[in-house]
Amino acid sequence: WMSLLPDGRYLSELNIPGTHDSATANVEGSWNASYNKVACQKYFIEQQLYAGVRALDLRTRWHGDDMVMVHGDFICHTPDHNNRSKNKTFRSVLDTVIEYLDKHPSEAVIVTLKIDSGDEDKGRLALVNILNEYTANYPNRFYCWTETAFPNTLVAAQNRMTSPTLGQARGKIVLMTRVDMSGAGESSLYSYTGPDLTKWDDSYKDRNHYAQRIESESKVAVYIQDDYSSPDGNKKKQVFNTVYQLNGTYTLPGALKIEKKDFVFNYTSKTGSDHYGSTPLGAAKYMNDLIYNDDLFTPGSKTAKENPRLGIVVMDFVNKQLCRRIVFRQNTPLDDLIHRRGGQA
């Protein structure tokens, strides 16, 4: 769907469907998602990409001799079931995204990366090695946040970063990391790891009902609304107010003005619902219904026209219909593209 959008628009300006805990479609103990507290997705990552998802939330940890995908302490598995499934590795996810971009170079995929559990020192070292390997082997598949990739300290790289246009990001993984990599000394890898999001967890408790900027040295601002323990009505207010903040529609006391070059992650996900039970699936039933039915997310509605920007809408249990609600809010004739691809975005 990005193929119909102009190169000159900032990637941060687009309305982008994203997934929370993207690798959890087959996770330890997820045989019944209704009762499971760690499964957050039905679609595997390749299916998400073909449904229109363009932002992935990847959680990983050191396990054995590799970095595996996890939700907390629970390991994610490959699509195979019964005794044939294997641990899902970070490398395999990168391979999946790169293969997708090889086939669809008009698209860009934002990836946020976090070590969710385990030995952080070993995990950090392993991630540095993996990312050095992949950015060296696939330099055209990773967005370089600085003008050129050369050895920098983390702070120096942060001060040289610029927000990408869609044209600059096409065909690339646009990486942002919640991992503290400052101990790597001078490294060209800092040109690829994006704005420093290590203070994410200092900002997620959005009790003021709007998105908050993550403190960092980066010249590219990143805002998040990610209160995952909020009651249903409060979470709805947080999601909606973040959209109003993005568009300057209402004056929200204390809320910072968001520029078009700024990235905004607006999480609809949470741990449970007052109405549908204390699981991510229960929360998704409540929040996803809002996206399906509310005028704010309805293409062409008066409210949508007054609030054209949604940011990166990060969801649990995403599907094609949810993605279309976000994608069609670009004020661009995307219907024809969807129909030509047989329903794939």
Predicted regions and their residues:
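Long, acidic (Asp/Glu-rich), low-complexity accessory segments flanking structured domains
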Residues: 1-55, 62-103, 107-108, 152, ...
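Short, flexible/disordered intra-domain loops and linkers
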Residues: 32-33, 82, 121-126, 186-187
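Acidic, His- and aromatic-enriched active-site or binding-groove loops in soluble protein domains
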Residues: 83, 132-149
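Active-site groove signature of glycoside hydrolases
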Residues: 105-119
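A residue-level signal for conserved active-site and pocket-lining positions in enzyme catalytic cores
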Residues: 111, 175, 313
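Short, aromatic/basic amphipathic alpha-helical patches
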Residues: 125-134, 186-196, 324-332
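Surface-exposed substrate-engagement region within the catalytic domains
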Residues: 143-303
